[in-house]
């Protein structure tokens, strides 16, 4: 019984983030009232050989933002979220006996592309542009963001660019969470996984610690080293991909 629009997104490791952004666009222009966004990633020799050729895999542990970080560890799996318009939600609640509260709100999306400037090297200025656009799209100020769920794969160049982008985007750095020390880098599905992680943080009032990181290389960044109780309201999620494609989105507590 499913119909209407079907799309497969493949903009590298930003794919999940862009899929969420496209879903938001479809809802905003009233092309549909509900979107199922699925992120999937297979791991194995056939899917990882070309990735490995880039020389970005660690032979140690994943250490996001650590002074001794040496690369990423690929992982896979699947994650799924369902987005619906506020109008459709309210209409459905009037017709159904079972009531429920939305788990969270997708409030903003931003994107940028390095283009010909540096397609294979992360650039802080373009990552910052993606974050700022997501905050603006959510009709928020930078001070309204209380948590950043970072891309933070543990690569030397990638983490440095993101740390610089965060510093350039915020007058006061919010809490920064990096989960890939626990999950590995889920590649194409990472953005959807982040949406689930952000929702769980909002639901249960906590921020997970940065597993694998022992020596924060960026002391100006408010990196969450140990799991802590915290009640976030607006979480900015980053997904950046090889080829210079960047996606950021804001998950907010539904009020």
Indicate residue ranges for each PLM-predicted region.
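Flexible, low-complexity linker/loop segments at domain and module junctions
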Residues: 138, 142-144, 221-255
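Stable alpha-helical structural segments in soluble proteins, enriched in small hydrophobic residues
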Residues: 19, 126, 130-138, 165, ...
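Active-site-proximal alpha-helical scaffold in enzymes
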Residues: 4-39, 74-95, 185-207, 224, ...
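Conserved small-residue
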Residues: 16, 23, 51, 82, ...
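Active-site-adjacent elements of ketosynthase-type condensing enzymes
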Residues: 42-64, 111-129, 153-165, 189, ...
């Amino acid at each position: 019984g499913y119909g209407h629009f079907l799309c497969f997104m493949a903009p590298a490791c930003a794919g999940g983030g862009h899929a969420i952004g496209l879903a938001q666009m479809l809802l905003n222009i009233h092309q549909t009232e509900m979107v199922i966004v699925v992120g999937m990633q297979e791991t194995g020799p056939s899917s990882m050989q070309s990735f490995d050729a880039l020389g970005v895999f660690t032979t140690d542990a994943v250490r996001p933002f650590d002074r001794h970080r040496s690369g990423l560890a690929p992982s896979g799996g699947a994650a799924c979220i369902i987005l619906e318009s506020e109008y459709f939600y309210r209409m459905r609640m009037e017709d159904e006996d079972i009531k429920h509260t939305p788990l969270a709100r997708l409030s903003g999306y931003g994107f940028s592309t390095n283009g010909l400037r540096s397609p294979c090297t992360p650039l802080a200025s373009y990552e910052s542009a993606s974050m700022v656009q997501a905050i603006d799209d959510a009709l928020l100020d930078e001070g309204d963001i209380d948590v950043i769920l970072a891309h933070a794969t543990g690569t030397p160049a990638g983490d440095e660019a993101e740390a610089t982008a965060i510093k350039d985007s915020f007058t006061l750095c919010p809490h920064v969470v990096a989960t890939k020390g626990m999950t590995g880098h889920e590649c194409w599905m990472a953005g959807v996984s982040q949406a689930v992680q952000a929702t769980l943080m909002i639901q249960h009032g906590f921020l997970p610690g940065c597993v694998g990181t022992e020596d924060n290389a960026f002391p100006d960044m408010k990196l969450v080293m140990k799991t802590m109780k915290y009640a976030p309201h607006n979480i900015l999620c980053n997904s950046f991909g090889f080829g210079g494609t960047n996606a950021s989105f804001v998950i907010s507590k539904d009020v």
